[in-house]
């Protein structure tokens, strides 16, 4: 698999979260359900001050390595702390979307960036192949950034960033 090493700036994201694990395929089910809620309940559309049209799947709060529990956040990037605060107040106080909305910060730093084309199956295949590779990971934040380049999910471009030391 080809990749490049990149330095990224901090990103403020807003979305919904679920703790999961890769054990027994649990994450596949949990992540799929979280995306359905994020898009299907109108959470994505309700978030104001989005930086762009891209969606992000964030892996964070690792309790060890990829075999241990972690949190997955279906989210999008917002422009500023002010946008973050407004969204948290409006969406949680008014219970606008029926889900608890959270904010996370994807830290600035060094990441291995992979680019794949495809849908959920191809993203899953990427992770199974990636876990066989030897990377000195930070286990702080990894994320998938969906480029929204097409309505055909089988041709979607996805940038996957793995936090590395």
List PLM regions with ranges.
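A solvent-exposed interaction/effector surface
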Residues: 1-165
């Amino acid at each position: 698999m080809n990749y490049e090493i990149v330095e990224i700036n901090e990103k403020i994201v807003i979305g919904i979260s679920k703790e999961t694990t890769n054990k027994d395929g649990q994450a596949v089910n949990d992540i799929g359900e979280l995306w359905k809620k994020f898009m299907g309940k109108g959470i994505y559309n309700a978030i104001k001050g989005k930086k762009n049209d891209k969606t992000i799947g964030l892996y964070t709060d690792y309790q060890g390595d990829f075999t241990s529990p972690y949190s997955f956040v279906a989210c999008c990037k917002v422009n500023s702390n002010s946008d973050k605060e407004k969204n948290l107040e409006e969406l949680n106080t008014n219970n606008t979307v029926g889900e608890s909305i959270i904010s996370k910060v994807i830290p600035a730093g060094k990441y291995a960036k992979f680019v794949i084309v495809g849908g959920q199956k191809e993203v899953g295949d990427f992770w199974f192949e990636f876990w066989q590779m030897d990377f000195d990971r930070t286990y702080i934040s990894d994320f998938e950034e969906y480029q929204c380049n097409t309505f055909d999910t089988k041709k979607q471009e996805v940038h996957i960033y793995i936090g590395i030391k």
